[in-house]
Amino acid sequence: MAEKPAAKPKAAAAKAEAKDQSDSYAIVEASGQQFWLQPNRYYDLDRLQAAVDDTVTLENVLLIKDGKNDTTVGQPYVKGASVELKVMDHRRGPKIIVYKMRPKKKTRRKNGHRQELTRVMVQSISIDGKALS
C-alpha cells in the first residue's frame, strides 16, 4: 500500500489562518440594535445615510474576540475599537402585511410595510489602529 504524503506545512498554516479569521468577531451597536459581525461577510442593517461603495466606520463596539482566545469586553464600549464597513447596496426587506379586523362591525384595515435596508460588507475589525482581520 502506498502511504499518503504528509500534509504540506503551508496548507496547514493556511487552514489555521482561515480558522483564526473565522473565529474573530465583534459585537457592535448600530441603529438601535446589536449585531455580531465577522470579517469578509455581508449583513443587512437599517438604512444608512451613505452612498454605494462608501466606507462607514462604527465606533460603538461592545465586544471584540480575535482568533487567539483573546476577548475584550467594553464598559459599555471598547476604547479605540472600530469596525469598517463598505456599503454594497440599498435594498428593501420582505413585505409584511398588517391586517386588523373588528368582528361583527364591518371594520377592516389592511396595511403593508417594507423595511429600508443597507447591505454592508465588513472590511476590517480593529482595536487601537491594529486590524484583527
Curated annotation (Swiss-Prot):
Pfam families: Ribosomal_L21p
Disulphide bond pairs: none
Stretches assigned to coiled coil: none
Keyword RNA-binding: yes
Region annotated Disordered, chain positions: 1-22
Superkingdom of origin organism: Bacteria
GO CC annotation terms, alphabetical: cytoplasm; ribonucleoprotein complex; ribosome
Molecular functions per Gene Ontology: rRNA binding; structural constituent of ribosome
BP terms from Gene Ontology: translation
Keywords: Ribonucleoprotein, Ribosomal protein, RNA-binding, rRNA-binding
Function: This protein binds to 23S rRNA in the presence of protein L20.
Quaternary structure, from the entry: Part of the 50S ribosomal subunit. Contacts protein L20.
Membership in a protein family: Belongs to the bacterial ribosomal protein bL21 family.
UniProt protein name: Large ribosomal subunit protein bL21
Gene designation per UniProt: rplU
